[in-house]
Amino acid sequence: MDKRAILRSIPNMNELLENKKIREFQERIGSEQLKKVIRNVLEQVRSDIIEGKTENAIDENHLKERIRKQLEKLTEPDMKKVINATGTILHTNLGRAPISKEHIQQILCMASGYSNLEYDLDKGHRGERYSHFDELLCRLTGAEAAMAVNNNAAAVLLMLSALGRKKEAIVSRGELVEIGGKFRIPDVMEQSGTILKEVGTTNKTHLEDYEKAITEETGMILKVHTSNYQIVGFTESVEIQRLAALGREREIPVLADLGSGVLLSMEKYGLPHEPTVQEMIQAGADLVSFSGDKLLGGPQAGIIVGKKKYLDILKKHPLTRALRIDKLTAAALELTLREYLNPENALRNLPALKMIAKTAEDTRKDANALCQMLQEKELPFEISVEPCESQIGGGAFPTANLRGYAAVLTCKQKKCQDIVDAMEQLPVPVICRCQKDQIILDVRTLEKEDMEIIVRELELL
């Protein structure tokens, strides 16, 4: 068919605006944006015709549907709830630690109006946003003072900028870590104006390495916990107690970046020992930073606890305002920390900790329940319960997995990866993994309502 004839078959703007399904978007986005979407689609259609990609007359119904889908994409939120069936509890790409529904309701109540974010109700004048949780952090960790910024990378940057600018920071070569997004300790040091002074080797660093490195230019000793990897074998590192003693002797602050950070021991759940924030403070670290949305089980935040004289310097630094947390984060962090006043409440009410604490038998029961729900439907799958291993994620416990059970689906009619891809396009996307041509639904990261959604949505495939 002649290109000019095909171009003439394209409906004009007014004809398309008369379509009810297209016109109903006008109230939501306005006539200008509506016309812009239609115009963009028409330009794409014309371009395809000119380039020879389309050889037939334009199907008007298909064109209208194409426009409607573009309008839906514009008007519907891009960020949405997904179901995490991967078994990775602190899945970075899926938002890390979930916030409990009870906390969300309290945050919603506060966020839908005004709040006392920076207002002291007792004294009737301006207050500090840290006041809602700093005493809690001190009570829980044994620190003298506390604050929070928007993530742990920001916390490290602030500590270095406020205490180490144009000074040397001594760090073991084995602790020059990189986390996701190519965030590297040396790069953060350069940005902060701190001069990196490496000591030791990749696998071994001794106390005398630190001692020999101290000069008049030394501003701090930085201890970085390698929470997202481990060096094993012929290794040695210096404990924080010995570094803290050296720092006190030489009058140099000792900073500890814990990365994930944890307030409760996880050893009883089959995980190796991870240094707690309390242990670092008791060992004598002057400042300790850690994440809010990893093993703490709260919102994204970079928490700093330690000596008051150093926290006072940090709070007055210009970067603090640029890195400060917002009211929603402050509220979520306070609610999260209050759960730790009784550790049993934290394990029961914080979703991430609750998932970690699940026993293998707990997951077996959940997997059996999900399988039974699936078997009641006429689905083209062979369904079984199989052993599996779940990951903590979020750069925590890199060598440790949690044993449990998963619901396993086998489909002979379709490729496993094709089904997994289709599940990610469902109204409530289900994120799972394909392993040996089987779909693995790890129930450790599923709530009961998630299972109900999975069963309902698998019928749509």
Show where each model-derived region lies.
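Structural motif of enzymes handling amino- and sulfur-group chemistry
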Residues: 309, 317-318, 325-376, 386-389, ...
